[in-house]
Amino acid sequence: NKIVDGDDVLTVMIYHGIGLKQSYYNDIDPRIDLRSVESESRMKELKSHGHKNLALTGFTKCDPLSSINQEKLNSFKLDQNLKTILYAPSFYPSSIEMLNQVFPELSYETNLIIKLHNFSWFQDKYKNQSKMMLELAEKNRNIFLVPRDDYNIIPYYYNADLLISDISSTIFEFLYLNRPIIMAECFNLRLKHKIFNKRFIKKMDLSRMESIDFVLRLEDPNNLISLVYHSLEYPKDLEQERLVAQREYLFKLDGKASYRMVNAIESKLIGSNN
């Protein structure tokens, strides 16, 4: 997308996700006047990459978690006697193809809400993912697929007792609620990334991925159900790690990241006018 230039224009960047891809550090235009940063650790990392005009705000996307509207959640008619799981995978690399076969059995005793990335709906090379999940939801009573025109994942976080994801930003966003997280590391890689694995590794923020200690990691899809039941029965497991991670990855959990961003914008504008 083209960024409008001009002395009377202030360009602000608020990143849509805070996941595990190197694009977080590289996907920035020199025209950006101010960039929202979600944590002190990321602030230091961006500065080490030479980025400037940074504002430490927290993650604005998570602000609504402090006041959730239940109306959207009730439309699914969830079984109130069952625990609710949210599955929110990335589009690539994704765990969808690997976990697809396990979900029907998982849904026997849980509500399973599936929230797909926008690319899984609208990009041709990923559309098979949404087709797969549509079929699952149609055939299984307790599996609910969030409609493609519902972009906002935040309300679904609130209703979930547990999150399952992979390399998605959701594993950091869900930290806000201090609830169990399962991180699937079983991916279906493209052929070129299977053959030339270094190309795939180059795209990932491996040091950040390896430092994650607040999740239960899943390598074998056949172990998913036992991990889910363990997490639901012992939700306090890894709680201390999650609380530490909240401070590490989300700065402040006060619902005021957007206010800090607005204040940073106003300060920038005042400075530009002086």
Language-model segments: residues:
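Short, well-ordered beta-strand core segments
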Residues: 11, 35, 163-164, 181
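Structural alpha-helical scaffold elements that stabilize or flank donor/cofactor-binding regions
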Residues: 4, 28, 105, 155-156
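Conserved acidic residues
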Residues: 9, 33, 83, 158-161
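Donor nucleotide-activated moiety binding/catalytic core segment of transferases
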Residues: 126-172
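Active-site and donor-binding regions of nucleotide-sugar-utilizing enzymes
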Residues: 1-68
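C-terminal alpha-helical cap of glycosyltransferases
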Residues: 254-274
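Catalytic binding pocket for nucleotide-activated donors in carbohydrate/polymer assembly enzymes
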Residues: 48, 53, 169-249
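Conserved catalytic-core segment of nucleotide-activated headgroup transferases in glycan assembly
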Residues: 61-134, 146, 218, 232-233, ...
